[in-house]
Amino acid sequence: MFVQEEKIFAGKVLRLQVCTMEGAEWLEEVPEDTTVEKLKERCLKHCVPGSLEDPKTVTHHKLIHATSEKVLTDSKTVLEENIQDRDVLLLIKKRAPPPLPKMADVSAEEKRKQEQKAPDKDAILKATANLPSRNVDRTVAQHNMRDFQTELRKILVSLIEVAQKLLALNPDAVELFKKANAMLDEDEEDRVDEIALRQLTEMGFPESRAVKALRLNHMSVTQAMEWLIEHADDPAVDAPLPGQTPSEAAAEAGASSAEATAGPSSEAGGEEAKDELTEIFKKIRRKREFRPDPRAVIALMEMGFDEKEVVDALRVNNNQQNAACEWLLGDRKPSPEDLDKGIDTNSPLFQAILENPVVQLGLTNPKTLLAFEDMLENPLNSTQWMNDPETGPVMLQISRIFQTLNRT
């Protein structure tokens, strides 16, 4: 019996089920070495007779493996595409690409976009060059619009002075602020993040240095580690943090004697208590003195700015490096000296704040004064005090009064 040579060496024959989107189904028997393109031609010849007269018909269709949802590559064989016997294939016509727009259409679209584009400053000035100027004072009115966060600092400075005077009249003020001062001491000296401290000591740093580094860097392990490495050879690295000065110690020592000897009817005792309260106020403010972000200081100094200028910029901009850089490159306003200036006490805004009953009651609360001091040096803590049941109503009234007067 005569057998064709290609039949002898032919590969395994697979029976494949082919489907179309129109619902036609049939079986195709193909050797496993058949290319996907040849299989596609056979499928098109079966379902669309005469379609192969157009050579583009094959390229406009694709075969998809139904199980894996994979589009088969024309140049690969059935074996290379890992098609098995009895697999189902889907013959689909490819989506025609959108026609390219004509040049006239492109020009019309660009012209339409240009017509709808908002005019820039130069175009406005050119179009209005021949018009008479009117309402030129509007620029001044707009310039006088005040930002709440900018004015809040001035308001707080002035309110702190008022609160200090009111609290100085309270015979229990010294005792109240001694307790508040002790709370600040506890926060600074006793509350050290144990986990952060353990991480640094496990790296080999002495505990005393690790504690100092954490306090200087707001309990940030990364910044504390950088500080320890940078100051490893510093002879003053083991020096204690600035604490009580001799005058402060004497003031506290005098406090106990003043409590024992001074009474409400003693004028001399009242003066001593007032001086002691002033010292406590100064001590509280010193404890909240500004500490610049060391990484921001280094980054800005590398740009060529002087260290003092960098510290001033960070203080004015609440340790925000980008804002500090803009301040250094700009007109440098507000100046660091402006931060300690209060609002005009005769202004309608400040008078309206002082006349508010909620504010008046809050100014007699030592916690309000501590909140004002904290927000003065740490503006990011404003949200915390806004949510506090004692200080929140005071801050809310200040905000409402400011917004009301700022709109008039």
From Swiss-Prot:
GO cellular component: cytoplasm; ubiquitin ligase complex
Compartment list: Cytoplasm
Location, primary (coarse class): cytoplasm
GO biological process assignments: protein maturation; protein ubiquitination
Residue ranges, compositional bias (Basic and acidic residues): 108-119
Domain Ubiquitin-like as annotated: residue spans: 14-98
Domain (UBA) ranges: 185-231, 291-331
Entry keywords, A to Z: Cytoplasm, Repeat, Ubl conjugation pathway
Ranges where the STI1 domain occurs: 356-395
Pfam families on file: UBA_7 (PF22562), UBL_UBAC1 (PF23326)
Biological or metabolic pathway of the protein: Protein modification; protein ubiquitination
GO molecular function: polyubiquitin modification-dependent protein binding; proteasome binding
PANTHER family: UBIQUITIN-ASSOCIATED DOMAIN-CONTAINING PROTEIN 1
Domain-related comment: The UBA domains recognize and bind polyubiquitinated proteins.
Protein name: Ubiquitin-associated domain-containing protein 1
Organism: Gallus gallus (Chicken)
Encoding gene (name): UBAC1
